[in-house]
């Protein structure tokens, strides 16, 4: 089994983002990606990852209003994992690597092939796209970040378009909007890093919460879902070799 720890926060208390690569234990095993709902922990990361690698995982494919899903049950006797959710549902569209091999409505044990733990800031210092969308009234435009990454092993580059937030803009401000937003975002973002969670997510550390980053606490981490964007690459390969090199911004009017 492979284990990986990504420390994006060094505090004694942190938010744990845990993702597993597992293989079903049956005659025709499917490869699955399992991510655990984020939880708070004060356990040293090196100790937590050891306990995370020793759990038992059961999965069952089900149907929900959101589409095909997986019901996940985690069994552990470790007090260290007391804060970790043990029963939850995740999207099968992101989780399943080999859909045809996964039976419906059958509970199956899994073998853990890899486990990744990312230490993020405490929940009060995390912001998502959904959080910002709820705080924007009468939006007129949306801000898209075009995040460029480079594979340091091959020098290949990929640009991932990520929806950041809706904004409300007056007509008189439209001409200068893009320059203003680009300046604000460049001042606000100190880094961006891909981590394995719900497929993949982008973590942006924000230093300035003016203008486009209003409602985000300074020094907080902004989390953007990428899903299975780079699914053909292994999670470890992506997180080790894909480095953030640049970010451009696009301001688009909302479409009806």
From Swiss-Prot:
Function: Plays a crucial role in virus assembly into filaments and budding. Early in infection, localizes in the nucleus where it inhibits host cell transcription through direct binding to host chromatin. Later in infection, traffics to the cytoplasm through the action of host CRM1 to associate with inclusion bodies, the site of viral transcription and replication. During virus assembly and budding, acts as a bridge between the nucleocapsid and the lipid bilayer.
Name the record gives this protein: Matrix protein
UniProt KW Phosphoprotein keyword: yes
Membrane topology (UniProt): Peripheral membrane protein
Signal sequence annotation: none
Region (Nuclear targeting and binding to host importin KPNB1): 110-183
Domain of life from the UniProt record: Viruses
Location in the cell: Virion; Host cytoplasm; Host nucleus; Host cell membrane
Record keywords, A-Z: Host cell membrane, Host cytoplasm, Host membrane, Host nucleus, Host-virus interaction, Membrane, Phosphoprotein, Viral matrix protein, Virion
Positions of the UniProt region annotated as Interaction with M2-1: 1-110
Post-translational modification: Phosphorylation is important for oligomerization.
Pfam family, one: Matrix_Pneumo_N
One Gene Ontology cellular component annotation held by this UniProt entry: viral envelope
Gene that encodes it: M
GO molecular function: structural constituent of virion
Family recorded in the similarity comment: Belongs to the pneumovirinae M protein family.
Subunit structure as annotated in this protein's UniProt entry: Forms dimers. Forms higher-order oligomers. Interacts with glycoprotein G (via N-terminus). Interacts with protein M2-1; this interaction directs the matrix protein localization to cytoplasmic inclusions comprising viral proteins L, N, P, and M2-1 and mediates the matrix protein association with the nucleocapsid. Interacts with host KPNB1; this interaction mediates nuclear import of the matrix protein early during infection. Interacts with host AP3M1; this interaction plays an essential role in trafficking the matrix protein in host cells.
InterPro entries: Matrix_Pneumo_C (IPR055461), MATRX_N_pneumovirus (IPR005056), Pneu_matrix_N (IPR043062)
Sites bearing Phosphothreonine, chain numbering: 205
UniProt KW Phosphoprotein keyword: yes
Nuclear export signal, short sequence motif: residues: 194-206
GO biological process: virion assembly
